[in-house]
Amino acid sequence: MAGLSVRHAEATPALPVPEPSTEAALGERMNANTVSVITGTPGGTYFRIGADLAFVLNNGDKLRVLPILGKGAGENAYDIRFLKGVDLGFVRTDTLEQLRRDTRLRNIEQHIHFIAKLFNDELHIIAPYAVKGVGDLAGKRVSFDVKGSGTDYSGRVMFRELGVAVEAINVDQPTALEMLRNGDLDAVVSVAAKPVAFITSFDPGDRFHLVPAPYPNTISEAYVPASLSPADYPKLVRGDVRETLAVGTVLGVYNSQKGTVRYEKLVRFVDAFFGQFDKFLAPQRHPKWREVNLAASVKGWTRFRPAQDWLDRHREQDVASQSELDRFLLTQSARPAGKEEVYQAYLKWRQAR
């Protein structure tokens, strides 16, 4: 459970910050307090998650989160590594392997670290009902979003891991769906966190559905089994749940040098993000936040030093939090049945105290 993995520190009231007296001072303060995060295409999950970061964490002149539209996880990694105006970005657990294959890059693991493992992005395959399983798409025309997107990389790798060779096409998702309707494509692929907005808004009629892609035992450990249910996509999943694959998303960060202005503002971001994480679990935020475990490690990745320091400082408080949870459970005459219900009741109890 996300919020039970660490206890969040109480906020310390800050002293008033004097207003800058010159235009140059104003610019310096704005740059020193603004953290940019590269997200994804409009309407996508990364775009919505980036907006949540801004809504929750923006705090006047102390911290501003500035979401930037991006192509997705594949291109985001290059943006984090090379663009001076990009501090953070949503990338995937298979992203470092993608960058290692680029012979132009050196020691990529030293430049891109992660702050937290977030959630899983599921493989979605939209195709006509005649396509019963992913194997039926062998040799067919399949769209993998725009070149450089997360779907372009992860989706292609997933198909290779599944042993299905296709004729890969790169077009944007709205165009791909229109091509699918017209018979110019055999399937449209999206690797994104469910529910995906452009998929939920797609009207399949009686022609299209989400194709199952069962998890094979031989697949890379970067990918995990997942499922898509009628609750996720009522129009596209009729009857049985669809088995599929998923890949993890992490909040990547440029590994800035300690003592720099960029490093110090990222320290403030980490403190705010971890310390106010409960706010991301509110009903108006994306449901994928509820999958997050802030303390989870990611194989092959190095955690950004300020994030690791924050977790280390709060380990003792985590023990205290467990004791507090025990006290809460003793107050419950009728204990909620599910983990999520327990956690939501616990949050209300703690806020009331």
For each feature predicted by the language model, list its residue ranges.
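Pocket-flanking alpha-helical
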Residues: 54-55, 66-107, 177-179, 195-203
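Extracytoplasmic small-molecule ligand-binding "clamshell" domains
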Residues: 33-38, 42-89, 239-241, 342-345
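Signal peptide processing junction and immediate N-terminal pro/mature segment
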Residues: 2-21
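Segments of small-molecule ligand-sensing domains
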Residues: 244-351
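Pocket-lining segment of extracytoplasmic ligand-binding domains
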Residues: 93, 103-104, 164-261
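Extracytoplasmic
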Residues: 30-34, 44, 60-62, 72-75, ...
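Bilobed "Venus flytrap"/periplasmic-binding protein-like clamshell domains
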Residues: 34-57, 65, 121-178, 182
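Signal peptide-directed extracytoplasmic domains
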Residues: 93-130
